[in-house]
Each structure stands twice: as C-alpha cells, then as structure tokens.
Amino acid sequence: MSPRSRSAPSAPPDSPTTAPTAAPGAPPGNRAAVPGPDGPDGAPPDRAPRRRPPSPGPGRRRVLVLAGSAGAAAALGPATGASPAAAPASGTRPQRRVPGGRAAVDAPHTGTTLTGVAAPSGDGPFRRLVTGPGWARVVRTELARAGARRAARAEPLASFVQFTDLHLVDVQHPLRYEYLRAQTASAWRPQESLSVAGAVSLVERVNALAGGPATGASLSCVVTTGDNTDNNSRAELEWFTTVLSGGRITPDTGDPRIHEGVQDCGLPDFWQPDSDLRDRDKAVGFPRLRGFLRAAGRQVAGPGLKLPWYATVGNHDALPGGCFAAADARGFFADFATGDRKLMRLPEEQGARLWRAVERGRDPGGRLFTELLRAERRHMRKVTPDPARAPVTPRDYIRALARPQALGPGPAGHGYTEENAVEGTLYYAFRIAPDVMGYSLDTTRRDGHYTGRVGAAQLSWLRRQLAAHRDRYALVFSHHTSTTTPEGGTELLALLRDTPHALAWINGHSHRNRISPHGTFWEVSTASHTDFPQLARTLELVDNRDGTLSLFTTLIESAAPHRTDFTDLSQTGLASLYRELAFNAPGARHGLAGAEGDRNTELLLRKP
C-alpha cells in the first residue's frame, strides 16, 4: 500500500521504532578529504506500522496561501523549470497556515541562505567576509514534472534539519596528525580551536527558525549525519552531546593553565595567533590576536536545541584519526591518546609516505602509524596526560548519548537503544512524521579506512524495515555518500531504487553540497560545518496533490554575524571568526558550496 498523505505533526517525533540486532564487525570511514576517514541479521521490527483512519479528503490540512500567488511562488518555487537551472524564487514571503493550527506569518526565510550568505570582500591574501546576495531556490525536475498549480495545493508532510560534519575537535589531542599539513590541508585547519563556539552558534540559528523556510511547517527534529567529533575521543563526544542538548562546555583538555597544541609550539608551520612569530599563515595575512588561545579554551554556554535530535555515526566518531582500525580501551592508540607525548613536526618525505599509505588503504590497522609514533618519541613535545582523551567504542558512544545529561529535548539515546549497545550496532529506525520514517545507517569501517561500507546484515535489516513500513515514506541517513561507499554502496542504491516509497538518501562526508537524482529518489549531500562555507540544511517534504511530491532543501548558516572584529573574542565573536578563518585557510578546497542546483532547491518526485 502506498504511503498516505498526512500533515506533519506539531508534536515531537517518536523514539526509534525498532532496535537492530547484532552487527558483527561493523566498519569505518573519513573526515572529508582527510584521513578519515554490521551487524548480523537483525530481529524483525518491534512493532508493525500503526493503522490510522484514511485522510478525509484532498483539502484536509492543506497549506492555505494567504499572501497571493507571488508569495506562493516565493515559498514553493517556480511553477515550471528544467533540471538544475531554474528561476529564482521571489523575495515576497507568504503567510500560510501550518499543521497544528498555528499560522506562520511570513515563511521563515530570515536566517537562511535565501536572503543572504557570507561572501568575501576586498583584495589581498586574507579577505574579510560580508553579507552577500542570497542563493535562489532552483526547481529540479529530472524525476517528475513541476505542475503549475502545485503551490496552491501543497500539503506539508515533514520538516526537519540536517547537521553534518561538525568535527568538534580537541586540538591538543596527541593522536592528531597536524604534521601532515603539507600533504593535506585537512590535517590541520587554523579555525579548528573554535569548533565548539561555531557549533553553538549553529544551534542558536536553528532555535531561531520559526518553521520550515519553504512551507512554514513546524520543524520536528534535527538529524546529524556523522563526524560529529574529530578524534574518536570521549571529551569530544561529551562536547557534542552538550552542544546539542545544552549546558556549559570547556573546549580544553590537559592542563587548563597552558595550551599544548600546535598553535603554541613556536613552529612556523602553523598559525601562532598569540605570538609575534612570522609563521606561514601570518605571511598570507592571518592576524596576530593576543589572547586568542585563552579565549578559544574558555567555557562556552550552549542553549541546546529546542528540537529532538537524532545522531548518525561517521568515521571520525568511530576511528582514531578517522581512518585507522577502531581502538579498544587498551592498546597502543588508547595509551597514546591519554599519554604525555604529542608529535608536532615530521620531515616532509616521511609525511608523504605515511599519507600515501593512508590514501591507498595500505595501513587500515594503523601499523605504519604506530611504528612512526614509536620511532619519533624523542622528537615529541611533552604534554599533560588526560584520560578524557580516551577512545570511544560503539557501546561507549551509545551509552554516552543515553546519559541523563545528554537527554536535552530527547529522545532518550537520540535514536540508539540499549539493544544497540548490547549488540554493538549503530543503525536504527525512527519516525520523523506520521507518514515519514527515517533510517540512520552505520557506514563506518571498523577495520580501518575513511571510505564507507554497508554490510550485508545491515542491508538485510534495512530491506526488512522498508518492507515493514511500506505505507510510510522513507528517508535514509548515513555519513558516507554513494560515491564514497565502495563496499555496499551499489547494493544500497539498488535497494532504494527498488523501493517506491524511498524518497531520499541524505548524507555528508564529502564536505560539499551535491544533489543527485537516482532514477526514483534523490541523494542530498550537505557541506560540513568546519570547512567554509560552514552550513546545515533544512528539508521539507510536501505532497503537491497532483501525483507528485516536492522535497525542499534550504541551506542555513550559524547565527554568528558575517562581519568579524579581531578585537571581539566573545563567544559570538569567536563564532564569526570561525567562519572567516575557514574561508582564508591556506590550501582549503573552494567550491564546496556546490552549484546552484546543489543548494536551495525544490526536488520533484513522482508520488508512489
């Protein structure tokens, strides 16, 4: 039976509807362009789809356009349009009635990239950011036509937010490989020490949204798609849960009186913000900022999300460095992570050899990395040991999300259940809206490597879930993309193509916006919140009541102002600086915002 049209609920979504069974040897993956980066057949779903009375007619709870046809076009996109090309949406914002009886005056475009986006100004190697023109909405019709009257008929089904690749990072962690900067710009980023302040500002932006930017419908939840943390570290995991659930965070480990990372090591290879040293970053315009490191490690106050949130695991959450085999509570990597030595510099030739091995998958277990660290011990800086830097196992990860302190707006476990913890699986199903199911997958490779994998057992579990909930639309979430999942990715694409009610595969990992049609569904990949342009995405599913559906995607930035002031080291000032440093990072990849058709879109689908 095809999914039925219903309006999105104003109440929070349910807890997971099913808990997967064992996932032996799940595997792990990457941190977008950096190193890094299933369980056995699960039990049947713990409950069958609930049967509800049929929808009482086509006019039921449909969106009512109160501001005229121009406003409708602005919110729902042009009535016609070919593939990624399309006329921009009008700036007029409509008033509309949304599920739950609450009228949304003006579809909430404010705070989205529809109205403005950070853009560089001026000349010189270090460019300041200002507010540039917004990105127009593009109507994409590769999978279905765009009916001329769809805006007037449209009925919202679901509205939620995607966070991906936050990379909350302990910049003093001993296992980090900043010394590979010459091989890959993602080994070290000058903005990294501000990741927590930046993520808190993103939460503030979501909390300020009045509803979905396209429909005005109430947002039901936030779903992360992995690389929530950077170093598979207990401290970073605590920061992540506190950022999303609310509380005070001190983004610092080791000795609170001193900074023991590469930004205070006296080497010209890295930006030394508090020093007069003429390092390679100051040579291209990076400022000298007295008090920067002290401010970066200062306590941050986070309001936490007002919405329920669900987590998906990425390779940096699961693997040391995002690319080496999962660490146990004991062993070399665990001991080194919590130990008193940190390597700051490596001859370029040695670094190149190690990086080639990582890229080519020759060192998934980290043998070469281990040998290197042992051989270079006498060249390392002595640092303050800290048990909070210990690696996190899958069970640690699940139980950390289930702690009372991590609850926030819920649900308990943020998708994961005690059964997941017992079985060691990191995939689950959850309800986004009455007629929309979400499926969070684990695409990491626990035996090492930053690329993705979907094992046979997990595919079998997903196939059963999709069959059990065939009367609801399906949205699949994972960290890795179809092009970065060499094992099981093709099979997953085939499964989704063969499932009429599967509408989208939503992911991250590549740190780049990209939206691709796959015959019957869309793949939506979203840029990270660590590399510029530092984005998240809202997604809104609409029934056009003409035999088609629309999936609206709208990019958002953090609430931090685009303009920065180098003298402002407040929490908000640091969040602004986080974005500007990312734009100017030497060697950073440009073009991560993607093309117009990868940003703010209306994606048409045939209704199954």
Label every PLM stretch briefly.
Residues 1-58:
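N-terminal secretory signal peptides
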Residues 52-53, 62-82:
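N-terminal export signals
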Residues 156, 224-247, 251-254, 298, ...:
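Active-site-adjacent structural elements in enzyme catalytic domains
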Residues 165, 226-227, 314-315, 479, ...:
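Active-site glycine-centered loops adjacent to acidic/histidine catalytic or metal-binding residues
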Residues 207-211, 241-249, 467, 497:
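Sec-exported extracytoplasmic/periplasmic mature domains
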Residues 445-507:
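Active-site-proximal segments of metal-dependent phosphoesterases and phosphodiesterases across multiple
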